[in-house]
Swiss-Prot record:
It comes from the Bacteria. The keyword Amino-acid biosynthesis does not apply. A motif (JAMM motif) lies at residues 173-186. This is UPF0758 protein lpp2553. Belongs to the UPF0758 family.
Amino acid sequence: MMVAHTAQQLDLREKLLTNGVHSLSDIELLAIFISSGNNRKSCLQLAYELTKHLGNLRNILNADLQSFKSIHGLGEVRYAQLQAAKEICHRSDFIDLQKEIRLSNTQQTYAFLKKRLRDYKNETFAALFLDNQHRIIAYEELFSGTINTATVYPRPIVERVLQLNAAALILAHNHPSGLSDASQQDLAITERIRDALDLVDARLLDHIVIGDNEVYSIFAENKWVCN
């Protein structure tokens, strides 16, 4: 049985190398990632069961450990590898964003923030710190809360701005509900942070709310916040 499983795995790798990665189905890609099965299941069978259980690649990438381990034959090692692969992709996206001489590509910025934040199950508050030429210094996730809210304090943000010698920043947070509209609480904390940054001569460029399929720019939709 193990010989057959190994041959199946080699066939998938040969298909990838011969025809390109785009020739593989989602299940086949997962099978290559899983790499090896066990005495009862091949890597392809494990990939099929995982996809059937969780639905699609996005759900698999964002699954918690217990959901992942519910498939017999998959454990902590494969889960850790999956999370590492996911983070590698995130960091690659950040490198692409940093290549901008100045952060002027709004859609690219939105896409990066959306990919980073939209799948979190709890509300997470992040910031892009920029220099005086609007070049990226750092991306950091600063606060995390419950499914409905994250408690955000201006002081740690200002302290981080000073530590990084940042001149400007873009804030972003997700709504786990999937809705991207800003709440009154979102508008209020935006004003508080903007005013706190003014005291240290740093500029808040925008606050982006990330929904499931859309993003909402508080500054674009509420011009009075910019003043």
